């Protein structure tokens, strides 16, 4: 037995010191795997335990849902992806990309919505014997983002250019979908058509099964966590500036019929900014575009201690990064507003995150925060 082993096995001071040293080294090695090291997460955990619990449950639920679908899958073709990154999808696109990279799932190609008539937009065939399209390890993954359009998976599965015998080999999967219009009559008809396909994935079961039921602010609601939740605790800790000449940024997608008096009365007190990102380079991919939009948004919101926005993806970013803001959710689309309110309920926090239906109300909320 060598000297180190004799010391370790002994009951003397040297043996105990060696054991303590090895135990401490093991804790240091395992710490990144056991604990999130992000400072934002630590702050949330200590200052807002309920809020932190909801965020953690959101991310855990997303991974549970996706891992259950994509276990063993090595390659995917993304369908129904947006053709360009935009204000209503940039953070979701980043979340989808992060999850797939984290799970080492290779994206063979992506097909944007709406489906064009180009030959390269059709799904791959499996008769070439390629391991890439081995039905055991390959899936067609619906990557629809929260943009409001009808679910068109059947365009790919049931399109006349794809023989039904080939379609039967597809493993059809989907990122979470959170809006009621995906359960419309057209979707149900499409799902009925693909029901004979082995290993089918029915979107209509998402709300009842894969999404689970989570308790949000005392109410049990069904919801699908946005793919951007995979970024939770992974983004760099971003701090808002404490004080500027104009304390509040109003970051809008439209003018909300603001009266002229608004500009006259508040133009010195608030900064009004409409969505106007820089142009994308010609060679940029959609993932490059999403990152450019992310950088653009961050460059705006960090300049001010508070902001108001009607852009849902910016609101999500504010929630994840603990940024003080009010989300402007007008009641112009009752159904969508209802579902957004349902799952955002838990993320409203006193003096940090709030939701308002009118811009003037949102500004009054922040003015109250500033007095505290």
Swiss-Prot record:
| Keywords per UniProt | Cell wall biogenesis/degradation, Glycoprotein, Golgi apparatus, Meiosis, Membrane, Signal-anchor, Transmembrane, Transmembrane helix
Give GO BP annotations, semicolon-separated. Answer: 4,6-pyruvylated galactose residue biosynthetic process; cell wall organization; fungal-type cell wall biogenesis; meiotic cell cycle
- Name assigned to this protein: Pyruvylated Gal-beta-1,3-epitope synthesis protein 5
Provide the protein's localization: Golgi apparatus membrane
Q: Which residues cross the membrane?
A: 13-35
The organism encoding this protein is: Schizosaccharomyces pombe (strain 972 / ATCC 24843) (Fission yeast)
Membrane topology, as annotated: Single-pass type II membrane protein
Q: Which domain of life is it from?
A: Eukaryota
Determine if Membrane is one of this entry's keywords: yes
- Its main subcellular localisation, reduced to a broad class, is Golgi
Glycosylation site positions? 38, 128
Chain ranges on the Cytoplasmic side, renumbered to this chain? 1-12
Task: Output the Gene Ontology cellular-component terms.
Answer: Golgi membrane
Which loops or segments lie on the Lumenal side of the membrane, by the record? 36-372
- Free-text function comment from the UniProt entry: Involved in cell wall biogenesis. Has a role in the addition of Gal-beta1,3 moeities to galactomannans and their subsequent pyruvylation. Has a role in meiosis.
tRNA processing among the record's keywords? Answer: no
